[in-house]
């Protein structure tokens, strides 16, 4: 019976038992005129832990995270594991008792102690979504759905953030789903553009290089900012595919400039951490250079300092390989916290 109702890794109630407990809690809250809160909790960057350190270490982090949360709960509260790195919490709030905001602040505080990963202190944060009974719903499935909606928007707002559910969020979620659909269609049709921004030397005022900038004009809408669609490409797992297209398009453009007698301009291409970790960046670049018969020194790979710190061994290995074949490497946002 315990195996059927409890998660074997964390020892917490599983999804089915959590739903049953929530239904009972809602009945009790209605009878006693209490407030009830459902809080969904998602670890940020948990996928990177699995990619960098392996799933066994990821399981260890999740188990310790669950234990830390359990230690700061009241007797009447229930913590369960819903799926993957997502936990959920039932808070029974009696009159005069501290509300969900205070509990989330306590959880955030216990997370501030870093986790030990192979001897390294690794900070972790989570995102939280909060739905309240009776304001946001009276059924278990509706409260969990609304808490998940709020958590999704908390993740978009930044790490270590929480959001209370509001009806307006449904409009925002619908808009995001429409944006995702349009973006998937753009990837399928390769409906992006690459703009080229010249780099001007201060000493002589001459063009000393070019930076490639990815742009997307969504049909029927204003141009979408890269600050919006690039993170969305990453969350949809499409950034490597688009990044490969950009690299090939840039190499094609460099070759065209050479044929037109414009000389040999070095072009910088921005690369995301996910493109390095999950894609095949080195082979993508080598293939495009060969296809367009380009000297590798005409291509510059630019990544942020934060990207460099994700999955560091693989990232460094890829960058060293690119450097060895002649591709220039540059770091953007240097000195921003690492």
Predicted ranges, named:
Residues 1-5, 9-37, 44-74, 80-89, ...:
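Conserved long alpha-helical elements within nucleotide-processing catalytic cores of c-di-GMP signaling
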Residues 220, 241, 245-271, 283, ...:
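Helix C-cap/alpha-to-beta connector motif
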Residues 79, 106, 110, 116, ...:
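Cyclic nucleotide signaling catalytic output domains
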Residues 47, 84, 283-338:
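The catalytic core of metal-dependent phosphodiesterases that act on cyclic dinucleotides
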Residues 51, 90-95, 112, 133-134, ...:
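Residue-level recognition of strand-loop junctions within catalytic nucleotide-signaling folds
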Residues 21, 175-232, 270, 331:
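Active-site core of bacterial EAL-family cyclic-dinucleotide phosphodiesterase domains
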Residues 80-82, 98, 111-127, 155, ...:
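Catalytic core regions of nucleotide second-messenger enzymes
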Residues 28, 71-76, 109-121, 153, ...:
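Short catalytic/binding micro-motifs of nucleotide second-messenger systems
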